[in-house]
Every structure is written in structure tokens, then in C-alpha cells.
A protein has these predicted regions:
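Aromatic/acidic polysaccharide-binding cleft in carbohydrate-active enzymes
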Residues: 102-108, 114-175
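A structural motif corresponding to the C-terminal end of an alpha-helix
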Residues: 10-18, 96-97, 133-136, 187
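Conserved, mostly hydrophobic/aromatic
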Residues: 11, 21, 48, 108, ...
């Protein structure tokens, strides 16, 4: 254990402050509890991310023994009900007190069916959901940015996996998401309402393929509303019920809506 601890300290000395731990549930729980506590004595700012896609009870225990952040089932939550139910579980139950989710649409090991068959729109959908539902999110970089969706037939694995071959990525490939991802990340950085997971509220929309939710800063100074079309194959439309009463806006009062993705502004 001491030798393994020395490895972590070596990388901390090189400036590393975030450790993604692969499959921590396959190692003894007492080891992780001891190691994380030892590291935090000197470096309380170090983050340990649990990369464990396993049973809920095991994922929760890893969070309780010290992992700051955890992988989740977001990767496989695609419908309106699936996403809503899961977010309520994460943000409105006792799990909120110890489990900090980190949303990943894909990983080097996992290419979910939604991305395999939904084309570029599916990648856009999952990116926006991950970036706006959770304060913490990540992507397996070039494969996601270039919308790579070729899978091993019948499996959720990349057909030509970077794990087994050296890739020469064409970052300017047609259809890439570079600028879109940069825009979304800029919006997250500039808007404090998106920098926490616990302020999430779902709102009414009359279409099962549209997900409508919002986040607000604690002081009420900023409100972000997000609408996502969960259907990667078709354009969808619907009527939203804007919660103007929460924002102190009277029904007969016009207000400014700023579309942060397009930078367009509207008077509603």
C-alpha cells in the first residue's frame, strides 16, 4: 500500500491534481479509503474520479469511502423518463449528500447504441445534456469530437479502437464538433448557474421528445433554461411553459430571452 501511495505522490509532485481510477471496485475498499485519506492530509484539493460502471450499491460505497466524483449511468439514459427519473435520484434523494456525478457520453471502452445509430445529432444531444445537467462532465476526446460511431457488431465497443492501434486524427474532418464543444464549454464557464448540479428543475413541455429544464444561481441573479430534442432523427416542436413566476416576471411583462448557443436575442 505504501508503495502504491508513493506512485500517487510522484504524480502529485509533477503537478497532477485529478486522478481517474479505472475500475476501483475490483480492488479492496479499505485500500481506497486509506489511500484517499492519506493523500488528503497533505493535498485536500486532489480529486479522485471513480471510473466504475457497476452495481448501484458498489458505486455508492466508493463515493462514501472518499471518491470525490463518480461515473454514472447517464451513458445509457436516453428517453425523457429515463433522464428525468435518474436526475431526480441524483439530485433529490439522500444520494445527493455523498455522490457527485460526472457525466460521460462515451469512454474509450464504451460506444453506446444511441451514438452508434443516431449520427452527428446524437453526439450533439448527449454533449448538451452532459454539459448542462451536470456541473462535471467529460468526453473521450477525438472519437467524440469527430463523431466516430463504428462499433463492433452487436457490441458497445469501438470497431477500430485507439486502445489497440495508433491513430492519426484529422481534427478538421467534416462534421467535427470542435467549435460546438468550445461554445458549450464557454457558456459553462461564463454562467455560474451551470456550475452546480444541485439546482436542477424540470419544467413542462407537451412533447415527449423534448426535455425542458432550468438552473438558477442561489441569489437568483441568473437563470438558464435548456431545451433538448432527444430525437436524433427528426425535428421536434412543442409548447413550453416558461416558469416566469419563479423569475419575478408578471404575465403581462415582456422579457428578454438570450439564446446562448446562437447569441440571438428575443423579446417574449
Amino acid at each position: 500500500w505504501e508503495e502504491l501511495k508513493s506512485v500517487v505522490f510522484f504524480w502529485i509532485d509533477q503537478g497532477i491534481r485529478i486522478f481517474r481510477v479505472d475500475n476501483p471496485h475490483t480492488k479492496p475498499f479499505p485500500f481506497w479509503e486509506w489511500l484517499i485519506a492519506e493523500i488528503r492530509k497533505d493535498y485536500p484539493e486532489v480529486i479522485f474520479l471513480s471510473e466504475a460502471f457497476t452495481r448501484p450499491k458498489v458505486m455508492k460505497r466508493l463515493a462514501k469511502i472518499g471518491f470525490n466524483q463518480s461515473y454514472t449511468y447517464f451513458t445509457w439514459r436516453n428517453s425523457k423518463k429515463e433522464i428525468t427519473d435518474y436526475m431526480i435520484e441524483l439530485t433529490q434523494t439522500e444520494q445527493k449528500e455523498y455522490f457527485r456525478p460526472n457525466f460521460w457520453p462515451n469512454t474509450p471502452d464504451i460506444l453506446p447504441e444511441f451514438l452508434q445509430f443516431g449520427g452527428r445529432p446524437a453526439f450533439v444531444i448527449k454533449l448538451v445534456l452532459a454539459a448542462t445537467l451536470s456541473s462535471n462532465y467529460g468526453i473521450y476526446g477525438p472519437a467524440f469530437e469527430l463523431c466516430v460511431n463504428e462499433a463492433v457488431p452487436g457490441k458497445e465497443e469501438y470497431l477500430n479502437s485507439e486502445k489497440y492501434e495508433i491513430k492519426q486524427w484529422n481534427w478538421d474532418q467534416s462534421g467535427n464538433l470542435k467549435q460546438f464543444i468550445a461554445r458549450v464549454n464557454r457558456i459553462r464557464r461564463e454562467n455560474p448557474a451551470l456550475q452546480t448540479t444541485w439546482n436542477l428543475k424540470f419544467y413542462e413541455v407537451d412533447n415527449e421528445y423534448l426535455l425542458f429544464y432550468g438552473k438558477e444561481t442561489a441569489d437568483g441573479a441568473e437563470s438558464i433554461l435548456t431545451v433538448v430534442n432527444l430525437d436524433p432523427y427528426h425535428t421536434q416542436s412543442g409548447w413550453l411553459k416558461i416558469p416566469i413566476y419563479e423569475f419575478g416576471i408578471s404575465p403581462d411583462q415582456p422579457y428578454l430571452c438570450h439564446d446562448l448557443l446562437s447569441d440571438d436575442k428575443y423579446i417574449w
